[in-house]
């Protein structure tokens, strides 16, 4: 079972890179159709292909600079041609002052090459949590902080997670870091934990699991009110586990720190044609005291077909449906070879108002039609990196 899950997810992450692999971050002012490109990540040598763009990276803003660390891509050839995924440990910095004309600078390395972890910016720096590479999954957590005096990135070790986690999501509120979803010791889980940055000796606190299916590659955001913190979880997917059908949620859950409970917050808006929508592999960021911006992610129908492929092949073979088995085999073999537009990555931007509990469409643009990217908030700007 473990091997099947890993194979299914490799297909998932590979699509991200084929469809929208880019090293040029994009700055969006929050107004319709106002987009600007930031400098591209450079190639440092012939063996470092980060200039091709990365997916599943850590990113955040600290001490007047943008940090991008880790991530993965395909060095020699794309996944559709049998390419091998490469994982990185580089840490890159771009000063926010003059970022439109500035240059990225390599300022350090992570403890290990890693992608598909979770990261979140706090006042002290960028917190990086979990992740995996081609050899293992990680329980590590550490803080990256730009030291302007020493012109270096300081890496401060934080308490390790109680188990190995990857393909999870993270957010912060007040002095807490929250993480949810992903794989737990290699298996999809409903895990939900938090770390008090003011009481590190207590380590990670295990909170109530979120309800429903497990969620790999979800999005997680928070809003802090006088009464406490509200956490919002959407997207993600559950592959075939214990003979259950793969499942992609199309809802938004919320967790209240006041009563320590999860609830169904809202359904996600459907597509223009009435098809289901998911923010799986997408991005979300909160702004102000009531707004959450959602961008990107996979197409529900396309991705459900992909993660159901192995199960459907087994059933067709078991039931002697040779023509169906042949057709599904052809579809599986060609899945990574379609033109970019075929994958239908979400290009719409939606806003959810946590006070009114209503959704509003804001804009659509090909810049947001990506998955495995990161979305940062800098004053009045949104910055989309990688994917």
Annotate each PLM feature:
Residues 24-387:
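Kelch-like beta-propeller repeat domains
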Residues 8-14:
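Alpha-helical hydrophobic membrane-insertion segments
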Residues 18-19:
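C-terminal motif of bacterial Sec signal peptides marking the signal peptidase cleavage site
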Residues 1-8:
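Bacterial N-terminal signal peptides that target proteins for export
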